[in-house]
């Protein structure tokens, strides 16, 4: 299914963008010629419209969605300041709500929902570019943050992508592209354990160019073009409840572009 084209200016087209699927909306967050811009695709109307801006516009965020709510944590503002600000987006009302700030400012973190709580994991907290090893847990009921040591699977240094994380059946997994390993987070021992290999095609540029997501009870990895001779993307999946990692190719498509953004809707 091809979506309609977005009616944006050149500034937005060439800016860094974030994408997030929440409810029946797809949000694309970037910068247009006049400042921060958000465009919203509605699955119900098959059309794009301009969305309301964040209360504190930011980029390079950690984000995740659950049902009709998405949470966006940290990031950087237009001046490059690393933020601890957090906001939620409600797809039913199309509005933003400011939430309590994180314990630490962080950019290029990864966000997930697990066991009904939101987690911001890894990222960079200051201009020295040293990656954070901790994560933070946000309880939606108490509206409080808790720091969790050593929750990042590693990586996330200068020039690298945020940690590649996925939640399936309320278990947390990570793709270690440098070692080509699949890891699982032990909630009991609070540590990462290698459980298998990634698909051999899962090559990346310091983590960029690969999408790693949870979709219901399965883990999905989307691999972009490897070189000029192989101009296509492939989608692999694995269902943890069915045994050790055995990746199945579930789709592929010819493409001439690098994979920049990925969002999964309806899992």
Feature map (PLM): residue ranges:
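Kelch-like beta-propeller repeat domains
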Residues: 1-267
């Amino acid at each position: 299914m091809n979506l309609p084209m977005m009616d944006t200016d050149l500034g937005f087209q060439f800016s860094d963008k974030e994408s997030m699927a929440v409810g029946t909306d797809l949000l694309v967050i970037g910068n247009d010629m006049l400042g921060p811009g958000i465009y919203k695709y509605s699955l119900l109307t098959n059309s794009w419209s301009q969305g309301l801006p964040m209360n504190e516009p930011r980029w390079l965020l950690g984000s995740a969605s659950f049902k009709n709510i998405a949470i966006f944590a940290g990031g950087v503002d237009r001046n490059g300041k690393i933020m601890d600000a957090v906001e939620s987006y409600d797809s039913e009302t199309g509005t933003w709500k400011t939430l309590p700030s994180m314990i630490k400012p962080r950019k290029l973190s990864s966000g997930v929902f697990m066991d009904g709580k939101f987690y911001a994991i890894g990222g960079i907290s200051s201009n020295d570019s040293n990656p954070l090893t901790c994560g933070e847990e946000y309880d939606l009921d108490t509206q409080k943050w808790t720091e969790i040591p050593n929750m990042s699977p590693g990586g996330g240094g200068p020039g690298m992508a945020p940690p590649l994380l996925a939640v399936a059946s309320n278990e947390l997994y990570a793709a270690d592209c440098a070692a080509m390993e699949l890891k699982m987070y032990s909630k009991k021992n609070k540590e990462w354990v290698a459980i298998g290999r990634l698909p051999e095609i899962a090559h990346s540029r310091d983590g960029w160019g690969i999408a790693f997501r949870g979709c219901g009870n399965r883990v999905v990895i989307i691999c972009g073009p490897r070189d000029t001779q192989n101009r296509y993307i492939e989608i692999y999946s694995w269902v943890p409840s069915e045994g050790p990692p055995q990746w199945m190719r579930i789709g592929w498509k010819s493409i001439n572009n690098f994979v920049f953004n990925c969002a999964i809707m309806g899992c």
